[in-house]
Regions:
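N- or domain-start disorder-to-order transition segments that initiate the globular core
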Residues: 1-21
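Charge-rich, well-structured scaffold segments of protease-associated domains
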Residues: 6, 17, 64-171
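Hydrophobic alpha-helical segments, principally membrane-spanning helices and signal/leader peptides
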Residues: 12, 31, 134-135
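A short local loop/turn or secondary-structure capping micro-motif enriched for an aromatic residue
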Residues: 22-24, 96
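M16/MPP (pitrilysin/insulinase) zinc-metallopeptidase core fold and M16-derived inactive scaffolds
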Residues: 25-90
Length: 171
């Protein structure tokens, strides 16, 4: 059974318990996705998804974030869609609260290091090329473009390959 709780600050939390498991999945859903992007911002939500794993105020590098979560025996990842971006980790149940702390710090206080931004740019461009080389994924993109032409819903969630290029880190 799942329970929805809204905190006084408006944060919505969904919890559920499966007593027969010894693991916990912690997910943070952010209301950021491709449908909210203007044409010149296409791909920004996906780009930010990647950047949040590059470091935060208390976990300043990608390696420190990975070592913290994997040190518990956990795994972490993220995904961007049209309406939300989700950051998640699956860890032993004993590490759930520490994992909440790590993911919350990533979302609330990301580092956005200029050098990391430039490195991630090439990773994202390669990822987009891989998607475009997959017949199944490409078919889905073309269907979306056909159904919703000239609209955010008709764009590739990751953005066009050229859209990832203009994003720059703040000075």
């Amino acid at each position: 059974m799942y329970k929805k709780t809204t905190l006084p600050n408006g944060l919505r939390i969904v919890t559920g318990q499966l007593p027969h498991t010894r693991s916990a999945t912690v997910s943070i859903y952010v209301g950021a996705g491709s449908r909210y992007e203007r044409d010149e911002e296409a791909g920004l939500s996906h780009f930010l998804e990647h950047m949040l794993f590059k470091g935060s105020s208390r976990y300043p590098t990608a390696r420190i974030i990975s070592e913290a979560i994997e040190g518990f025996g956990g795994m972490h990842n993220a995904a961007t869609d049209r309406e939300v971006t989700v950051y998640y980790a699956k860890v032993p149940d004993s590490a759930a609260f520490q994992t909440i702390d790590i993911l919350a710090d990533m979302v609330r206080e990301p580092m956005m290091d200029a050098a990391e931004l430039e490195k991630e740019r090439s990773v994202i461009l390669e990822e987009l090329a891989t998607v475009e080389d997959s017949p199944g994924e490409l078919a889905g993109i073309l269907i979306d473009e056909t159904m919703w032409p000239s609209q955010p819903l008709g764009r590739n969630v990751g953005g066009p390959r050229r859209a990832s290029l203009p994003f720059r880190s703040p000075p």
